[in-house]
Amino acid sequence: MFHSIDEAKGELVRTVARLCAAAAVTAPKSGGQLFLRGKPLFIETVFIDGRETLARLARWMRQRGRERRQAIWLRDAALAESLDGALFIGLKDWYPPIYDCGACGFATCAEFMEATRQRRAESDLFEFSGPHCNLRDIDLGIAVGSAAKAASLYSVDTRCQTRIAVAARKLGLIQSEVAVALSMTVTHKNPGFDARMPAADFDVRETARDLPTGTMPIKTPDGRWQHRPDLEPEE
């Protein structure tokens, strides 16, 4: 028995998150025959609902917003703090479907994987690493959509977001190379929509500044742009 939805929604959201994860895993994917031959799952699902962890995500996002002078990160940071939970769905240890479709610009999957091997390794410090197989990115979108549909069947409000997923990846909460966060709430109004952009004065110094996020593009001596967590961008 419960006397208020507040008493029940923690367990409710966790249960629905499990069902959403199942929907993401069982969603259609390219190269289904490869699974029948023993290939492993490449969809990662991680659920987070702890208030301290959600606050960590929000702090990272606020610092990211200050670094880039982008208020939208501050808006989504406030949203992260208000969530009942977030289900992260991403591509981890993916492999191509061996369709040789050419959508990546290469004639074969093998050629694409070999030609981009070094770039994928070097981009691991980026907010998301890449490049990816286009079909696998489509698979990720289908998985996220399937999860959102499952949540809607049980009247849990969601919104698909990438900024919270970036924070989770950079904080080591998920291992995916690219991911989407399915924010989950049980409230009178879905807080993921219609939130106003906060007023922000980026010229005011914070009294207690967090460490740099390491996501500011910095031009290296060889003329390339990199995300260097060991360097702080010039003012």
Stretches found by the model and what they are:
Residues 1-235:
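Acidic, surface-exposed loops and disordered segments
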